[in-house]
């Protein structure tokens, strides 16, 4: 009998695994490659809806409705549900599920990529979205106007823990502080793999996000520019983080533009490195590390730079 090469066995197993991932439900095949993991546990679905505290007058934005397990429950509670779904097959399944029911007229479906879709007005958002778009979707939500009341969102467990991490936590990062600048964030519950069909490879969590209204009086692009620099190496002192030549070139360019606009003469012996160090020292952050700094610390640091004409966007 001829030997079967290990590479061929590996490829065959890979194809078998792919086929197993495309699970069938009523003839419908789920594509895990684009994050199709349908939440099937009715207890989890009911708990998520309870956490949303819906009002009869609410317009709900649902992202990733799948086959409508949560959608039909939302339609019973809300005035209207706007469901955003990428897969036309699931859209057809969704329409079929509510067709002829008393709540059918309350459903509007937007077909397409939610990141490229102009979101309508909504009061509350509920989402079980593909985990690979978690970060851009969070910030699309938080920068959306007019403000919504709250969002109940399913995320990969580690991503959820990053959202709620505090200064000093191992998972505290740029995502943590940027989200918490714009919103109050709470971890609501853990959701195991077997509550989905097909099961994902990671554990999940449900998070509640409530935007701060009014938002802090800060230019977010400017804020993020500063935070991005400091969290590249969050365990370094800020003095070390700002010694990067790329960072210094960017800040010097921005400073020279600022001086040109405001007719400020720059001395011939000007050194951006010296100016940065002077600001870090005067604000008391020279030896601080991003991993232990909170929102108020970063606001003070940003104001310190801006007061000296240095901007990050």
UniProtKB/Swiss-Prot annotation:
Claim: Methyltransferase is one of the keywords in the record: yes
Catalytic activity: adenosine(1779)/adenosine(1780) in 18S rRNA + 4 S-adenosyl-L-methionine = N(6)-dimethyladenosine(1779)/N(6)-dimethyladenosine(1780) in 18S rRNA + 4 S-adenosyl-L-homocysteine + 4 H(+)
Cellular component terms (Gene Ontology): cytosol; nucleolus; nucleoplasm; small-subunit processome
Keyword tags: Methyltransferase, Nucleus, RNA-binding, rRNA processing, S-adenosyl-L-methionine, Transferase
GO biological process, one term: rRNA methylation
Highest taxon in the source lineage: Eukaryota
Major subcellular site: nucleus
Keyword S-adenosyl-L-methionine belongs to the record: yes
PROSITE patterns given in the database record: RRNA_A_DIMETH, SAM_RNA_A_N6_MT
EC numbers: 2.1.1.183
Subcellular location field: Nucleus, Nucleoplasm; Nucleus, Nucleolus
Region (Disordered): 1-21
UniProt GO MF annotations: 18S rRNA (adenine(1779)-N(6)/adenine(1780)-N(6))-dimethyltransferase activity; RNA binding; rRNA (adenine-N6,N6-)-dimethyltransferase activity
Residues that bind S-adenosyl-L-methionine: 37, 39, 64, 85, 113, 128
Family statement drawn from the similarity comment of this UniProt entry: Belongs to the class I-like SAM-binding methyltransferase superfamily. rRNA adenine N(6)-methyltransferase family.
Described purpose of this protein according to its UniProt entry: Specifically dimethylates two adjacent adenosines in the loop of a conserved hairpin near the 3'-end of 18S rRNA in the 40S particle. Involved in the pre-rRNA processing steps leading to small-subunit rRNA production independently of its RNA-modifying catalytic activity. Part of the small subunit (SSU) processome, first precursor of the small eukaryotic ribosomal subunit.
NCBIfam families (alphabetical): ksgA
PANTHER family: DIMETHYLADENOSINE TRANSFERASE, DIMETHYLADENOSINE TRANSFERASE-RELATED
Name of this chain's protein: Dimethyladenosine transferase
Lineage of producing organism: Eukaryota, Metazoa, Chordata, Craniata, Vertebrata
């Amino acid at each position: 009998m001829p030997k079967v090469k290990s590479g061929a066995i590996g490829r065959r197993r890979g194809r078998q695994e792919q086929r197993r991932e495309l699970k069938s439900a009523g003839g419908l095949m789920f594509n895990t490659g684009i994050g199709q993991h349908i939440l099937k546990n009715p207890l989890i679905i009911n708990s998520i809806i309870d956490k949303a505290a819906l009002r009869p007058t609410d317009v709900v934005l649902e992202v990733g409705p799948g086959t409508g397990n949560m959608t039909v429950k939302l339609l019973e509670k809300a005035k209207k549900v706007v469901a955003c779904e990428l897969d036309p097959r699931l859209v057809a399944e969704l329409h079929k599920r509510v067709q002829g029911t008393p709540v059918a007229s309350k459903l509007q479906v937007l077909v397409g990529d939610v990141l490229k879709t102009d979101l309508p007005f909504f009061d509350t958002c509920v989402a079980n979205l593909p985990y690979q778009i978690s970060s851009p979707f969070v910030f699309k939500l938080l920068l959306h106007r007019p403000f919504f009341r709250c969002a109940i969102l399913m995320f990969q467990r580690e991503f959820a823990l990053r959202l709620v991490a505090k200064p000093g936590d191992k998972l505290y990062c740029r995502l943590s502080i940027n989200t918490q600048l714009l919103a109050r964030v709470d971890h609501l519950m853990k959701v195991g793999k077997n509550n989905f069909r097909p099961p994902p490879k990671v554990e999940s969590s449900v998070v509640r996000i409530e935007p701060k209204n009014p938002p802090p009086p800060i230019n977010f692009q400017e804020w993020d520019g500063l935070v991005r620099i400091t969290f590249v190496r969050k365990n370094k002192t800020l003095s070390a983080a700002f010694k990067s030549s790329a960072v210094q070139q960017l800040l010097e360019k921005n400073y020279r533009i600022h001086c040109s606009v405001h007719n400020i003469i720059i001395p011939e012996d000007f050194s951006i490195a010296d100016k940065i160090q002077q600001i870090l020292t005067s604000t008391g952050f020279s030896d601080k590390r991003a991993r232990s700094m909170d929102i108020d610390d970063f606001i003070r640091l940003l104001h310190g730079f801006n007061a000296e004409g240095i901007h990050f966007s």
